[in-house]
Amino acid sequence: VIGGTNASPGEIPWQLSQQRQSGSW
């Protein structure tokens, strides 16, 4: 997920948080 705002089915909050912070996704 690029942007990490909307969670896709199967994504969980800690994954979204790490994606937003790292910015590598």
UniProtKB/Swiss-Prot annotation:
GO-annotated molecular function: hydrolase activity; serine-type peptidase activity
Record domain Peptidase S1: where: 1-25
Entry EC number(s): 3.4.-.-
Annotated stretches, region: Disordered: 1-25
Enzyme class label: hydrolase
Note: Activated by sodium dodecyl sulfate (SDS).
Function: Cleaves the carboxyl side of basic amino acids, small neutral amino acids, and Met residue. It is also a plasminogen activator.
Protein name: Fibrinolytic enzyme large subunit
Species whose genome carries this gene: Eisenia fetida
